[in-house]
Amino acid sequence: MLARRRFLQFSGAAVASSLALPLLARAAGKTAASAPTDAALTAATDFAALEKAVRGRFGVTLLDTASGRRIGHRQDERFPMCSTFKSVLAATVLSQAERQPALLDTRVPVRDADLLSHAPVTRRHAGKDMTVRDLCRATIITSDNTAANLLFGVVGGPPAVTAFLRSIGDAVSRTDRLEPELNSFAKGDPRDTTTPAAMAATLQRVVLGEVLQLASRQQLADWLIDNETGDACLRAGLGKLWRVRDKTGSNGEDARNDIAVLWPVAGGAPWVLTAYLQAGAISYEQRATVLAQVGRIADRLIG
């Protein structure tokens, strides 16, 4: 409760730019001693300083689901979703399955022509078929791109996912193309983008809200907690006080993202953390280190 009170006090106040802390040393693994209140006072400026240190563009939202308050950096700017869209794609499938009970067990052919370069699960099933349920699991847990495209075919294409987003109150996020084209991004092009704030609200709705039935929410949460691609990202910076359900995304060029629902092990309301990074001046592995640092900043504030 102390951490949540600190967060509420901080998120309702403006933070002057003079409070910014240099984050370059911290990103390399060093820490600075600070009182609990210091963590609250410096979180937003820490995010901005981290962005400056990596010479990129960085958006983050930390949402307290108990109060609706949030803090972050560039929360309302558009970023390419990359594979973080797959959480919403799976939610779209689950929503349709609530009206079509046999959908998750429907078998979908996996053709050689369907296979993309990142197809760790579907490649093993080429020439055979997979259930929609197994395709969802593959695209969330291993970020299998072929599975994602096959699921687009199941639900009605990218426009159907955007329609689902609009139906649950997300007027910002959108899916327009298939893998791998959806990963390309140019400034001013809204295709296949979201904002940190919009995705935080959407993740809250589909995992914690009532837009999906309880069984569907539990299924989505189970897939997210089994995710195999996020250990070096937000999870790496969050302490053992949290059970993390997340979905990562990257484009292999400059973007690396991670979105997560954080459940306190000790109980209490969850938090949602979304982080979108564009930093072409650093390596793929270094981008993961930046996301881990975001986890540390969040953990310092709410842990």
From Swiss-Prot:
The class A beta-lactamase family has a specific amino-acid numbering system, sometimes called Ambler or ABL numbering and often misspelt as Amber. A multiple sequence alignment was used to derive a consensus sequence and then the consensus was numbered taking into account insertions and deletions. This allows use of identical numbers, e.g. for active site residues, despite differences in protein length. UniProt always uses natural numbering of residues, hence there appear to be differences in numbering between this entry and some papers. Residues 1-35 form the signal peptide. Predicted to be exported by the Tat system. The position of the signal peptide cleavage has not been experimentally proven. It comes from the Bacteria. Belongs to the class-A beta-lactamase family. Substrate binds at K247, T248, G249. InterPro entries: Beta-lactam/transpept-like, Beta-lactam_cat, Beta-lactam_class-A, Beta-lactam_class-A_AS, Beta-lactam_L2, TAT_signal. The active site is at S83. Keywords: Antibiotic resistance, Hydrolase, Signal. This is Beta-lactamase L2. It comes from Stenotrophomonas maltophilia. It catalyses: a beta-lactam + H2O = a substituted beta-amino acid. Gene3D superfamilies: DD-peptidase/beta-lactamase superfamily (3.40.710.10). One of its GO terms (molecular function) is beta-lactamase activity. One of its GO terms (biological process) is beta-lactam antibiotic catabolic process. Its EC number is 3.5.2.6. Disulfide bonds: none annotated.
